[in-house]
């Protein structure tokens, strides 16, 4: 899912201009999603985007409408390069700084609305137990880890307390070691463990296109698998 751009000045022709009509049209969707659990994954490109502050405001609005939000942020993409000790320390510092910035933006409430300066509770914690990746092809992966366990009860307790749960792609081992994790894997395990109703991933990736270069607006799981197979076959030709 790509980041939204600033809204156009003129509303679409089919958008109701009467506030009452607009509310009547949106009320069924608000009612349908109230109380649902949604995991929102923020890839590195999303958090660095100029429009990110508007994304946070949209998430705050979703929360105010009764959606239980778990926000996972990726502090940096994991590449194939071996992580050095200096790079690991820098990665941890970046992750903690990014978490602080996201908490700061949520603390603003919803600007230009009755919820401006309203207190939105954001909860972070040691929700993820991790284990080391270990040695691959004779190379020690140092601070890279894998998800071992998710504290589902702790996250549910935060959500039931009307908090937004903010999860950094870091994990701790029972021995107190700290590991950096694959954010996509964290999103997947969280969504499955919580039985989330939706998983939304926001990034700077443009999406999946068909053979003619047209963007798929909607895909079932089977259609997505077929699209990936077709893409792989085309690359081999």
Show the residue positions of the predicted features.
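Nucleotide/pyrophosphate-binding catalytic subdomain
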Residues: 1-237
């Amino acid at each position: 899912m790509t980041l939204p751009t600033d809204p156009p000045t003129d509303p679409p022709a089919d958008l109701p201009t009467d506030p009452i009509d607009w509310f009547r049209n949106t009320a069924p969707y608000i009612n349908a999603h109230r109380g649902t659990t949604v995991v929102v994954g923020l890839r590195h490109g999303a958090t660095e985007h100029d429009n990110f502050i508007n994304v946070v405001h949209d998430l705050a609005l979703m929360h105010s409408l009764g959606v239980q939000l778990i926000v996972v942020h990726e502090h940096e993409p994991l590449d194939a390069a071996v992580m050095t000790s200096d790079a690991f320390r820098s990665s941890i510092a970046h992750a903690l700084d990014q978490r602080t910035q996201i908490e700061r933006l949520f603390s603003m409430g919803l600007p230009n609305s009755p919820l401006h300066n309203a207190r939105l509770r954001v909860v972070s914690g040691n929700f993820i137990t991790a284990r080391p990746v270990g040695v691959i092809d004779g190379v020690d992966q140092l601070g890279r880890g894998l998800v071992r366990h998710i504290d589902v009860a702790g996250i549910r307790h935060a959500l039931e307390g009307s908090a937004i749960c903010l999860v950094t792609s870091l994990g701790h081992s029972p021995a107190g070691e700290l590991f950096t994790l694959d954010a996509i894997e964290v999103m997947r395990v969280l969504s499955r463990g919580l039985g989330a109703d939706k998983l939304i991933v926001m990034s700077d990736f443009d999406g999946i296109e068909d053979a003619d270069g047209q963007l798929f607006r909607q895909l079932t799981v089977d259609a997505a698998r077929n699209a990936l197979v077709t893409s792989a076959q085309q690359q081999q030709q």
